[in-house]
Every structure is written in C-alpha cells, then in structure tokens.
Amino acid sequence: MKITKTLTAMAVALAATTGTSAVALDELVVGYFMEWPTANQYAQHNKLYDEALGIPVKWVSFDAGTAMSAAMASGDVHISYSQGVTPFLVATAAGQDLQVIDIAETYSDNNNCVVRSSLEIDADNTDELKGKQVALPIGTAAHSDFLAQIGHFGLAESDFKIVDMTPVDSAAAFASGEFDMVCGWGGPLRRMKEHGNVLLSGPAKEAVSG
C-alpha cells in the first residue's frame, strides 16, 4: 500500500505550536469524527488513554478536517485524530505548524460522492453532470476525491456549481431534495446513498482516487 493512500485514510495532526507535551497538560483535547468507526473508539470509551497518560482526555467531535485545523490554530485542540491528508496539507501550506504523527489504512469506499437517483446518471453518461449543483466540504479528502473522479470522466470543477457544506449538512439537504450530487464520508455517506448512487466503487474507485 502506498504511503499517499494510507495518509489519505488517517492523518493525525499534532498542534506543535503549543510547545508542551501531554504530561505537562492538565487535559489533552483530541478532535475526531463521531460517525467514523475506528479502533481507537474502544480505548476512548473505556478511558484507556486517560489511564495511560495520567491526565483526562477530552474528545471533541468535528464535521470536517478543516474545522479541526482551525481549532488547533486557536489552541482549543491539541491532536486531530483522522483529520485527513487534504486538510492537513491545506493547513501546513498556509503556514500552520502541524505534524503528522501516525497513519492508517485506506478507506476508499467510506469516502465517496453520490448522484441523485432520479437523474439516472452513472459512469456511462457522466457528461450529463455538467451544470449540476454539488455540495461538498471544500479542502477535505471528499473534495480531493471529487476532483479525482470528475477528472477521470473528463470533467472539470468549473463544470459544476459547488457549494461548500459539511457531509452532515449536505446529507440532510440531499434527503430533502436539494442538490444533484453530494460528497462525504462515514455516517453521512450512508445516508446520502439512501437517495442516490455512486459513480465508482471498490477497485475501480481505488484506482482513480485511492
């Protein structure tokens, strides 16, 4: 498995600007995605991290990795768990002092874009997507995935009307009939699929966007 793919799966970013270690803190604050099932949640639920570190660990849920970056920049969060490579790269490119401290496996089928079923658009007629309105969280892994998929089908970002929206909000909007296409991950992605279909999945998607 390529490192680029595993980084896309889970980028843990450390707010190095705090200049402190965990043992010097009264409390460690960790950002995470509530609807993103990961093995660490067992230890989180059973407070095993608190026990190992000797201090309370406060877990704060976020809807997107970009929000995690903002929280770390303000000092409100010390570590972002499963932030995603795209938000990390965007933040560090802008000068934010973050450090990747661990990586995990790829999650190709748990991050995708969904087209409204009534449009009857699939991988064979993607030209019909031109001019459609898409809701996605800009600057995240879902955004990168969207760009990779439309590029594979010969489309450009300028072919769409894009609205910056978190997966949680876009899944709700999609269910109420808004938007032609939405992109997201985890629990919101499952809800999106109740009203639409993906263009690529499995090995085909892995080959295009990882």
Residue ranges and their predicted role:
Residues 33-36, 63-65, 79-89, 94, ...:
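Beta->alpha turn/N-cap motifs
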Residues 73-83, 94-98, 132-133, 175-184, ...:
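Alpha-to-beta junction loops
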